C-alpha cells in the first residue's frame, strides 16, 4: 500500500508567486463562484470568463467580480482555470480558449478527466496543473470566509517553467485549501479514483444498494413506508457518523445487534463476486472504455441518463420518499 509522505499547508505556499498575474476563472457555477471570490479576497487579480451574458454574468457582477466573454478573459490571462463541467471543456477549449490564449499561459483544472483522456491536448509551452478541492463550491467558500479551508489534491501534468508546483500551491492557498492540507497526486490517479468512487459507491453503488434493499422488503410484504425508513432515510445518520468519527466511531455508536449483523451479513452481501465486479469497473475506467462510452453518450443527448432519471423519479421508493418528506421535516428542530 502506497501512502503520500507529504501534505502541503500554508507554510509550503506563497501567494507572491502569482501576485500580479491575471487569473481567468472559466465558469461561475458552484466551484467557479467560490474560487473566484476566494482568490479575489486573497488579493489576487481575477476575472471570470463566460460564454454568454445571463444569470451567471449578473451574479458575478453582483459579487464584485468582473465578467468577460471567454475569448476576452483568456487573451490577457496568465493563468486559465477550467471550472465548467467536464463535457463542456473540450468544446470551450477548441472554440474559445486555444485560439485566443496568450503563449505560455498556465492551464489549471479541478478534475483530471479532460487531460487524462486527452480530450484537451495543451500546448507544450504551458504549465498544466490541478487543484481538486474535496468539497462542493459553497463549502469551499463558507470555510474560507470562516478562516478555514477544504482539503484538496494537487497534481502537475506539465512543468515547463519549473515552478508549476509553487504556482499550484499558491492557487490552493488562494482558495483556502492549504489551511487544511493539500495532498499530492497525479491526473491519472485523481481521475480514475474519482470516477471509481462515483460509480461503485457514491452514486451507482449506494443507489442500487438502497433500491435493492427497499424492493426486497416490499416484495416480502413489508409496508413501503417502513421499508423506506429502514433502507434509505436512516442512511444519512450513519454517513454523518462515518464523516465525523470514522467507521470505528460509527460502529461504536450503533447497537451491539447492529454491529454483529453488519459484520456478519455485510460480508455475505458484499462478497467476493461484488469485489470482482468492482475491479472490472475499475478496469473499464483505466482502459478508457468508460470515457469513450460517456463521450459518445453525451454526444447523443445522454439518453441513458435521461431514461434512468425518469425511472428513478417514477419508482415506488421515490414516491414514498416524497410522501414522507413532510413527516421527516416536521420533526426537525427549528433553528
From Swiss-Prot:
Whether Zinc counts among this entry's keywords is: no
What sort of enzyme, by top EC class, is this? oxidoreductase
Family that this chain belongs to: Belongs to the ketol-acid reductoisomerase family.
> Which Pfam families does the UniProt entry name for this protein?
KARI_C (PF01450), KARI_N (PF07991)
Q: List the disulfide bonds.
A: none
Q: Name one GO biological process term.
A: isoleucine biosynthetic process
Q: What is this protein called?
A: Ketol-acid reductoisomerase (NADP(+))
Q: Where is the signal peptide?
A: none
Cofactor binding, note field: Binds 2 magnesium ions per subunit.
Catalytic residues of the enzyme: 111
Q: What does this protein do?
A: Involved in the biosynthesis of branched-chain amino acids (BCAA). Catalyzes an alkyl-migration followed by a ketol-acid reduction of (S)-2-acetolactate (S2AL) to yield (R)-2,3-dihydroxy-isovalerate. In the isomerase reaction, S2AL is rearranged via a Mg-dependent methyl migration to produce 3-hydroxy-3-methyl-2-ketobutyrate (HMKB). In the reductase reaction, this 2-ketoacid undergoes a metal-dependent reduction by NADPH to yield (R)-2,3-dihydroxy-isovalerate.
**Organism of origin:** Saccharolobus islandicus (strain Y.G.57.14 / Yellowstone #1)
PANTHER family associated with the record: KETOL-ACID REDUCTOISOMERASE, MITOCHONDRIAL (PTHR21371:SF1)
Q: Which residues bind Mg(2+) 2?
A: 194, 230, 234
Gene behind the chain: ilvC
